[in-house]
Amino acid sequence: MPKHRQPTLPARPELVLPERVTIALAELAGAAREGLLALAVGTGIGVLGELLAADVERLVGPKGRHRPDRAAVRHGTQPGKVTLGGRRVRVDRPRVRTVDGTAEVSLPAWEAFAPTELLDRLALERMLATLSTRRYQAGLEPVGAAVEQTATGTSKSAVSRRFVAATERALAELLAADLSGLDLVALMVDGVRVAERCCVVALGITLDGAKVPLGLAEGATENATVVRDLLAGLRDRGLDTTRPILVVIDGAKALRRAVTDVFDHPVIQRCQLHKLRNVTDRLPEAVASTVAKKMRRADHHADPLLAQAELETLARELDRSHPGAAASLREGLAETLTIGRLGVPPTLARTLRSTNSIESMIAICRDHAANVKRWRDGQMVLRWIAAGMGEAAKQFRRVNGYLHLPALRVALDATIATVTPTKEDAAA
């Protein structure tokens, strides 16, 4: 029986690649050895070259073929730089001019890659992540030795200039934002000290529960003038100050005075945590813990009248032994229980009983500026705080219990209606 034989296949001809392709593959292989990111940058430069060539051909026509109706002609090349891999990379930019030579014709691909806004944003993000200008280049992705040799834009001074430009834009955008479309139910105002200066910042809570950084102002202290200027600026930018609004503050008299000067119907909620600290700081440690427990129990009481009665009783108990603590407890006592009188449910009250939300935003600003060793001037303080507020906004979530905010709006309107005569009543 004859054995089955496999058919003999003809020899496959050796694939011979053009020299141009072989050189390109060798360059890509070299970049691949330096890492995938370096390969991506090398590929990006190659793709950019093809895009530029395609733009030129679309405007001028194929090289060597005369087009009588063409409106532009090739005009050689010129050294230029594009943004790739967090750097400014040198490439040769083809030039195209009108047939009469009077004007340069822009190439869409070049217009897309040439701007430096991306580098400004990268500098802002990395600096706010506490990467110093000295270590900036070490934090960039690898782009390959060949690209690195000619790349620019990573020096300490260049990064610093870009960061300043980016933070100036962040400050300008924050202070110029249109607020007319915001439907605020609550507002928080607090101060932050940076070096020898004080910045007052404002955070709004909208009807749908979003937290919105509103603005900031700089001064020597947290005084009524600085706060009033900040709030008046919000009003000038379109914020409605005629509707009732819950304003949460830490109890500083300057804040309260400025709020009542600018807003027509503010309903003040003093931060319960600040009140607790102010009282217990005036007590010996053995007594402070007991007083703190009684204050927390009263603050969380379902009945605001009973809560106020308990706190007034506690103040009387402290009158003889610790009069300073008793006076601190009585000062603005009713305003620490505002959310209870408004019937705010516990889930939403957790957010509105204190200034924790705005203090968390301030803490993020401080964290981002941790590497700053020398504050040159007030403008530098404003730039850093504004940039930090912008970064904090990216981390914001809707407040707990936001579904109860429409009910809070109704309660605020009802509260004001009971103390403010209507136009019809005044006429009568």
Residue ranges of model-derived segments:
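Acidic/histidine-rich catalytic cores and adjacent linkers
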Residues: 1-12, 19-31, 43, 49, ...
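Inter-helix linker motif
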Residues: 264-281
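RNase H-like nuclease fold core
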Residues: 2-4, 65, 72-77, 82-99, ...
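Metal-dependent DNA phosphodiester-chemistry modules and their immediately adjacent helices/loops
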Residues: 91, 279-309, 313-316
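Short, charged amphipathic recognition helices of the HTH superfamily
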Residues: 129-142
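Short, amphipathic alpha-helical "recognition" segments used to contact nucleic acids or chromatin
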Residues: 118-130
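Short, conserved DNA-binding cores of transcription-related domains
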Residues: 2-110
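Short, conserved catalytic/metal-binding motifs centered on acidic residues
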Residues: 52, 136, 186-192, 211, ...
